[in-house]
Structures are given as structure tokens and as C-alpha cells.
């Protein structure tokens, strides 16, 4: 019997698929082959949550528990790894996962060293980003319900064990019963205790009951909460009740803060900090190339290899030639804050030092002191002092506050000179809200606050107003930079460039840039007015 052409093609295709399937199975399951999925060995730890991890109070540890594997599997194991899916051969139409092992970018000795330094940076990041409001607090059973006051967090669409739940009933009862109600998630248990009745597993309303109080409390240690609604930053206020008593507590639903870490630099011999590896100097220039070159020359006297980033919106730009200068050009008159954004966007170091283009470094411009402050405190930004030719030095320490106004009128901004308190461990340094235009800051925090490019002519304190409440600011009066003299002797020739600069830099009270700034503050920050001392 002869096969027609279609049947023959189908038979050939079937045999080819079968051969590929057998080849795939044999290579995947062949004994003695190295496992292609294992990229690296993660830090040794328990491969999964075991019974000891679920027994938080020793007094209930003797009560047996039947673990619910499907629920325990939803909990964070704190032992992640990255594995590819599939075998050696990439088969068509099959979705596969590709894993990348970042540790392969280092040799063994370098990996050990960089892992230690990364952990040190991470712990410093946690110390800066966490507060007392994040700590877990358990309310004692005064009601007689014990429950967490704060500090319970779950990632969106993830599950956690809920800590601290307990019933401390003084009177003997036939049945001890508690109830949990959520609105944005569901309840379950990671294990079942014999003698405890559960109603509502996998639902938003869970009831637990038992004639034996210890067994009920052992079961409460195994209660899990699962986020069921994707909201990146919210909270579920849940209710926990027993007969005659009800309490409420909050479960935060959010992603943990994602660190932005910078590798620590090696220290040159005899130096406290490698400034060139830690700091980039950033400035915005407009027309004043003589002042800019003087600034660069003064920096090179003390920091020969530090990178300098320049944002330039001059009409006829002049290129600055220096092996460690990055010069970026902008449209003419683009603006003061737009230039700041451009300069900061190109910084790759942990810290950025902001300076005006007419500053001059001296022996008192000790960047090491400012770096030391940021390395050893949770501050995000620390300013220095600017010394005028008269010898007077200013730190421009400013306190900012916003007072609520009447409905519909907007709030009132209060600005006054001063500081909140001294910075412990650093003489001549204080904590404040705003500082002079000479400061060292964490690069990621400056980018987070940003400079509003709508402020294009005159602006400074507006940056600190944008950062009020999120930017931790300090000031040290003993780190000083000089300000080039603005005094013009009458017998010297006029500088057309300086006159043009002055027209842009010092607009009158009725200039449209000032009006635009006031309109912006009115709407953006919902302000009706401000006072300044």
C-alpha cells in the first residue's frame, strides 16, 4: 500500500519530533552529567522553613504541628538562587529561563573582598533608610489579645507569617476562639495543630477555635497573610478579635527599599579617603570662562585627578581642555536648575560636590571632612562655608517650615536663619534644612529630589524646599571655599561678558523670571505666601 505525499510528510515529522524528544530526555536525565542549572553555591542556610522557624515561643514548641507544604512554599525562604530552565538544547516553541551569575564577573579573591565591602555599604544603607517606625512591636496581651503594633510588612502578592498573635485568656472557657479579618489579603496557616478547628482558610475571614488554649496559641504562631491586590505601597488594617474584645493592626504592603550602593574605593597611602574615587565636582557655567578656569586651576592644586563635570549654556561656548573634565553644552540660556540636572546626571561617584563657577579652592577646602561626615552619619547632604574677599564667611543655614492656611488659600512657607541642633561627634557641624551653594551630597539623593528646570534664572532654596522631609541636611563651618571678588575697580576696562551675565543673573523684581517663580511656588507647593528672616 502506497502512502500519499501528505501522509509521508506527517510520518517524517512525527519521527523527527520523537527523536528530538528522546534526545532531550536522555541528555536531561543522563546519570553522571554535571548539573547545568547550578550556577553558584549561595550562602549556606536552611533550604526551607522548618518546624523550628515556625516555633517562635518555646513554651508552645512541644505541641505537634502538621506542616502545610503548599502554604510554607509561599513564604520567603531567604535563600534564593538563580537557575536556568531546560536542558542543554534550546527547543523551539518552549519558553525557557536564562540565568546570569553576577559572581562570575569576579575572581575568587576579588569576590570575597567585594562581598565584604558590599555588605558594609548595605548595612550603612539600612541604617540610613530605616527608622523606629519600621521596627516590629508586639502589644502585650492586656486586652487579652496580643498582636503586633507595627513592623509587619509583606511584598505585593506575597505571603508572610504574622508574628506576635496570641490569646492570653485568664478565665477557663469551654472553647477558646479568635477571628481575623482582612480587606486586601487572605489568611491561611503554615501548619495544622491537632485539636484546633479552622474556618475560612484561604479567605479574608479566618476563625480559629480550640478547647485547649496552648494549642490555639501554637496555631496562631502559624497564621499567614497573603497579599491579593497588587498595590505597590499601601496597607491593610486588619482586625483581630475574641469574645468581647477587638483590636486592629496594620500590615504594610510594599516593596522593600532597593539599595543603590557604590563600591568603596581603595585608600592611597597616607590618605583618609580617596577623593577622586568618591567625589565628582559639578558646576554650571554661563559666560564666565575666566572664573571657570580659575576654579579648575584651584581644584587641581589640591585634587589633581578628581573629575569635574560642567554644564554650559553660554551663547558662544569655549571648550575646556583637561583630562579629568567633562564639558556638556546646552542651548543658550537653558537655565540654572536645568544645568544642575544635566551635571548631576553624569556623575558616577558616590558623592557629588556642587560649586559655583566663581569659587576658588584653598587649603581650608577640605573635602575629606565633608566625606567623613556623610560616611559616618545618616545625613544626605552637608554644606560648607563660602568666604568673601572681605573675610566674612557664610554658611547660609536656613530653617524651613510650612504652616497650614485657611481652606482654599494655601499654606505659608517660613524661612529663617538657624539650625536644629549640633551634629554629635563633629565640632563646627550642625543639622539644618538648607545650606549655601557649596555642598557635598549623596548622588542618588540629589537625583531623587532633583532640580526643577522651570526655575531657570534665580533659584537655590527651592531645591531644599523640594527635599524638605526627605533630604537630611547638615552644615560644617570649618570647610571653606573662597568666592572670587565681585569688586570692579573704576579705572579698569568694562567687560561686556560680565554685563551680559549680570542682566541674566540679577533680574529686577518685576522681571518675568521672578514672576514665573512665584507662580510656580504658588501652584506646585500650594503656597499662598512666604516669610524670610
Swiss-Prot record:
GO terms for molecular function: (N-acetylneuraminyl)-galactosylglucosylceramide N-acetylgalactosaminyltransferase activity; acetylgalactosaminyltransferase activity. It is a single-pass type II membrane protein. Signal peptide: none annotated. Its main location: Golgi. Keywords: Disulfide bond, Glycoprotein, Glycosyltransferase, Golgi apparatus, Lipid metabolism, Membrane, Signal-anchor, Sphingolipid metabolism, Transferase, Transmembrane, Transmembrane helix. Glycans are attached at residues 79, 274. Residues 1-7 are cytoplasmic. The keyword Disulfide bond applies. Its EC number is 2.4.1.92, 2.4.1.-. GO terms for cellular component: Golgi apparatus; Golgi membrane. Residues 26-533 are lumenal. Disulfide bonds join 429-476. GO terms for biological process: determination of adult lifespan; ganglioside biosynthetic process; glycosphingolipid biosynthetic process; glycosphingolipid metabolic process; limb development; lipid glycosylation; lipid storage; motor behavior. The keyword Transmembrane applies. It is found in: Golgi apparatus membrane. The chain crosses the membrane at residues 8-25. It comes from the Eukaryota. Pathway: Sphingolipid metabolism. Strongly expressed in brain, testis, spleen, and to a lesser extent in liver. Gene3D superfamilies: Spore Coat Polysaccharide Biosynthesis Protein SpsA, Chain A. It catalyses: a ganglioside GM3 (d18:1(4E)) + UDP-N-acetyl-alpha-D-galactosamine = a ganglioside GM2 (d18:1(4E)) + UDP + H(+); a ganglioside GD3 (d18:1(4E)) + UDP-N-acetyl-alpha-D-galactosamine = a ganglioside GD2 (d18:1(4E)) + UDP + H(+); a ganglioside GM3 + UDP-N-acetyl-alpha-D-galactosamine = a ganglioside GM2 + UDP + H(+); a ganglioside GD3 + UDP-N-acetyl-alpha-D-galactosamine = a ganglioside GD2 + UDP + H(+). Belongs to the glycosyltransferase 2 family. Involved in the biosynthesis of gangliosides GM2, GD2, GT2 and GA2 from GM3, GD3, GT3 and GA3, respectively. Homodimer; disulfide-linked. PANTHER family: BETA-1,4 N-ACETYLGALACTOSAMINYLTRANSFERASE 1, GLYCO_TRANS_2-LIKE DOMAIN-CONTAINING PROTEIN. This is Beta-1,4 N-acetylgalactosaminyltransferase 1. The gene is B4galnt1.
Amino acid at each position: 500500500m502506497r502512502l500519499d505525499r501528505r501522509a509521508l510528510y506527517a510520518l517524517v515529522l512525527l519521527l523527527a519530533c520523537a527523536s528530538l524528544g528522546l534526545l532531550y530526555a536522555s541528555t536531561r536525565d543522563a546519570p553522571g552529567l554535571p548539573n547545568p542549572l547550578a550556577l553558584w553555591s549561595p550562602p549556606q542556610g536552611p533550604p526551607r522553613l522548618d518546624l523550628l522557624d515556625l516555633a517562635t515561643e518555646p513554651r508552645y514548641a512541644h505541641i505537634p504541628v502538621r506542616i502545610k507544604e503548599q502554604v510554607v512554599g509561599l513564604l520567603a525562604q531567604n535563600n534564593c538562587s538563580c537557575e536556568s530552565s531546560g536542558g542543554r538544547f534550546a527547543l523551539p516553541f518552549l519558553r525557557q529561563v536564562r540565568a546570569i551569575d553576577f559572581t562570575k564577573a569576579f575572581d575568587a579573591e576579588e569576590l570575597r573582598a567585594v562581598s565584604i565591602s558590599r555588605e558594609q555599604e548595605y548595612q550603612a544603607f539600612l541604617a540610613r533608610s530605616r527608622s523606629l517606625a519600621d521596627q516590629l512591636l508586639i502589644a502585650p496581651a492586656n486586652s487579652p489579645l496580643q498582636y503586633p503594633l507595627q513592623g509587619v510588612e509583606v511584598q505585593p502578592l506575597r505571603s508572610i507569617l504574622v508574628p506576635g498573635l496570641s490569646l492570653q485568656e485568664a478565665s477557663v472557657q469551654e472553647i477558646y476562639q479568635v477571628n481575623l479579618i482582612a480587606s486586601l489579603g487572605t489568611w491561611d496557616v503554615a501548619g495544622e495543630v491537632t485539636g484546633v478547628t479552622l474556618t475560612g482558610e484561604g479567605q479574608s475571614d479566618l476563625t480559629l477555635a480550640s478547647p485547649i488554649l496552648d494549642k490555639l496559641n501554637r496555631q496562631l504562631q502559624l497564621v499567614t497573610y497573603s497579599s491579593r491586590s497588587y498595590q505597590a505601597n499601601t496597607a491593610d488594617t486588619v482586625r483581630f478579635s475574641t469574645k468581647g474584645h477587638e483590636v486592629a493592626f496594620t500590615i504594610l504592603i510594599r516593596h522593600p527599599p532597593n539599595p543603590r550602593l557604590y563600591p568603596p574605593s581603595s585608600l592611597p597611602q597616607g590618605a583618609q579617603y580617596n577623593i577622586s574615587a568618591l567625589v565628582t565636582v559639578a558646576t554650571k557655567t554661563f559666560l564666565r570662562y575666566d572664573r571657570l578656569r580659575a576654579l579648575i586651576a584651584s581644584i587641581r592644586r589640591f585634587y589633581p585627578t578628581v573629575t569635574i563635570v560642567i554644564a554650559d549654556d553660554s551663547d558662544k561656548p569655549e571648550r575646556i581642555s583637561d583630562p579629568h573634565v567633562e564639558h556638556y553644552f546646552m542651548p543658550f540660556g537653558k537655565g540654572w536648575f536645568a544645568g544642575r540636572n544635566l551635571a548631576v546626571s553624569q556623575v558616577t561617584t558616590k558623592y557629588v560636590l556642587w560649586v559655583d563657577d566663581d569659587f576658588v579652592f584653598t587649603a581650608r577646602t577640605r573635602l575629606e571632612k565633608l566625606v567623613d561626615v556623610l560616611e559616618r552619619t545618616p545625613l544626605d547632604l552637608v554644606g560648607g562655608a563660602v568666604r568673601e574677599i572681605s573675610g566674612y564667611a557664610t554658611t547660609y543655614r536656613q530653617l524651613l517650615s510650612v504652616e497650614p492656611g485657611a481652606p482654599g488659600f494655601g499654606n505659608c512657607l517660613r524661612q529663617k536663619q538657624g539650625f536644629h541642633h549640633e551634629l554629635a561627634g563633629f565640632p563646627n557641624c550642625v543639622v539644618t534644612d538648607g545650606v549655601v551653594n557649596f555642598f557635598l551630597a549623596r548622588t542618588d539623593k540629589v537625583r531623587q529630589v532633583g532640580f526643577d528646570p522651570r526655575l531657570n534664572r534665580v533659584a537655590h532654596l527651592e531645591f531644599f524646599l523640594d527635599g524638605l522631609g526627605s533630604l537630611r541636611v547638615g552644615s560644617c563651618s570649618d570647610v571653606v571655599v573662597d568666592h572670587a571678588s565681585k569688586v570692579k575697580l573704576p579705572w579698569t576696562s568694562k567687560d561686556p561678558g560680565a554685563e551680559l551675565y549680570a542682566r541674566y543673573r540679577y533680574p529686577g523684581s518685576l522681571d518675568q523670571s521672578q514672576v514665573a517663580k512665584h507662580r510656580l511656588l504658588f501652584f506646585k507647593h500650594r503656597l499662598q505666601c512666604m516669610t524670610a528672616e
